[in-house]
Amino acid sequence: MKTYCILLLFMAASIVRAQEAAPKVALLNIGGIDKPGGTITGIVRFKGAKPEAKTLTDIAGNAYCKQCYKGELPKHDDFVFGKNGNDDTLVNVLVYVSKGLEGKKFDPPKEPALLDQAGCMYTPHVVAVMVGQTLKFRNSDSTLHNVMATTWSNPPFNLGMSSGQVIERVFHQPELKINTRCFMHPWMSAYIHVLDNPFFAVTQADGTFTLKGLPPGEYEISVLQETSLFEPAPATAKVKIQANESKKIDFVFAPKAK
C-alpha cells in the first residue's frame, strides 16, 4: 500500500510539472499582414429561425471530463452565435481571399498557431493556418487525449497525447475543413483550415473579421462554415481595393433550403 501511494504521488507531481512546462502559445487570427495595403472589415450574420445547440450530454459519462464543469455542460459547437448565443452574428466562420492572389507568394508566419485540448474540448473550435506554418497541439487536461486528423491533401495522423504534451505539425498543401477529433472522447471536434495566403480570418465572438495589408487589386472573398444546416447568400463577394483603402463587406447565412 505504501509503494502504491508513493507511485500515485509521483504521477500527480509529474502531471503538474508537465502542465507547468507546457508553452504558452498565442491563439492566432492572422487576418492579413502588417504591411501597408487595403483593409476589408465586416460581420457575418444569421437570418432566420435560430436552431438551438444541443448539450454535450456524453460528457456526463466521463468522470474526469464531467468534473471540469461544475454547472451546466457545454453545448455542441458546430454552430455558435455571437455574444454567448444572444445575437444574430456567427462565430467561427472562415473568411478568406479565394481569388485574386494567383502567382503571388507569401512567407508563412514564424509564430505558431495553437489548438488546445482543455476541459475535454478543442479550443478554439476553428483554427486557420498558412501552408508551412507550425500548428501546435497541446493537451492541457489531466487525462489522456489523442489528435486524429482526417485529411485529403495532407498526410493524416492519429497521435496519443499525455497530459501537458505538445506536438507540432506543418501542413504543406492548402486544404479546408480538416476534421480533427479525439478518439477517446468522441464529442471533441475541431476544424483546421490551411490556406496558401495570409489573407484570412475566423470570425470573433461578435461575428466580426478583418483582412489587412491587401495589395491593390480585385479579389473574391469567400466564407465557410462547417455545418450543413446553414448556407451563405452569397458565398462569395467581389471587391476592388486600392492601396490603403478600407472597405466593408458583410455576409449573411440562412437555414439551408430543404
Predicted features and spans:
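Hydrophobic h-region of N-terminal signal peptides that target proteins for export
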Residues: 8-18
